[in-house]
Amino acid sequence: MSIIIGIDPGSYVTGYGIIKSEKNTLKHIKSGSIFLKKHDFKKRLKIIYICIKNIINKFKPKYFVIEQIFFSKNPSSVLKLGQASCAATLAAINLDILIFEYASKKIKKILVGDGKAKKLQVKNKVCSILNLSKSIGIDTSDALAVAITHHYLINNKDKIF
């Protein structure tokens, strides 16, 4: 049995999702989003770090899995997204958790079968797999998608995705 925390980093909203993985079964433990809009950027990074650290301390995951930063036409946005990702990852580093990172295309390919799938398709698949209400936010479903992807990869090492 392993607890996996998935993170969808963002400089305004960071999603998180925690699942319990046992061989071929998954159970949703907790998920949500950290909303950061009203704070200056440095304060947002601190909030991400503290919130993720507290979540990790509470649920004691074996794996920390984060969605890879993708290239954007706006260098400033990429830099801020990278810093948000680092703030979350630093919490895992400081707590000695195994860290993995997956590209969005790989997550979509594994969950939906199409690396170019739309966010709504991913959300619907996540809700189906975990028996969740479709009212969860996109950031939350993306974070759960990262965690589910890791579950599939560690339990199907012999398969090529």
Curated annotation (Swiss-Prot):
Is Translocase one of the keywords UniProt gives this record? no
Principal place of residence: cytoplasm
Pfam families in alphabetical order: RuvC
Enzyme class label: hydrolase
Question: Keyword set for this entry?
Answer: Cytoplasm, DNA damage, DNA recombination, DNA repair, DNA-binding, Endonuclease, Hydrolase, Magnesium, Metal-binding, Nuclease
Which cofactors are required for activity? Mg(2+)
For the keyword DNA-binding, the answer is yes
Q: Record's CDD domains? A: RuvC (cd16962)
**Where does the chain bind Mg(2+) 2?**
67
Q: Which GO terms describe its molecular function?
A: crossover junction DNA endonuclease activity; DNA binding; magnesium ion binding
GO CC annotations on file: cytoplasm; Holliday junction resolvase complex
- In short, the EC number is 3.1.21.10
Enzymatic reactions:
Endonucleolytic cleavage at a junction such as a reciprocal single-stranded crossover between two homologous DNA duplexes (Holliday junction)
Entry note: cofactor: Binds 2 Mg(2+) ion per subunit.
Q: Where in or outside the cell?
A: Cytoplasm
Annotated Mg(2+) 1 binding lies at 8, 139
Q: Where is the active site?
A: 8, 67, 139
Which Gene Ontology BP terms does the record give? DNA recombination; DNA repair
The similarity annotation says: Belongs to the RuvC family.
* Subunit structure and binding partners: Homodimer which binds Holliday junction (HJ) DNA. The HJ becomes 2-fold symmetrical on binding to RuvC with unstacked arms; it has a different conformation from HJ DNA in complex with RuvA. In the full resolvosome a probable DNA-RuvA(4)-RuvB(12)-RuvC(2) complex forms which resolves the HJ.
Tell me, what does this protein do in biology? The RuvA-RuvB-RuvC complex processes Holliday junction (HJ) DNA during genetic recombination and DNA repair. Endonuclease that resolves HJ intermediates. Cleaves cruciform DNA by making single-stranded nicks across the HJ at symmetrical positions within the homologous arms, yielding a 5'-phosphate and a 3'-hydroxyl group; requires a central core of homology in the junction. The consensus cleavage sequence is 5'-(A/T)TT(C/G)-3'. Cleavage occurs on the 3'-side of the TT dinucleotide at the point of strand exchange.
Recorded protein name is Crossover junction endodeoxyribonuclease RuvC
Q: Which organism is it from?
A: Wigglesworthia glossinidia brevipalpis
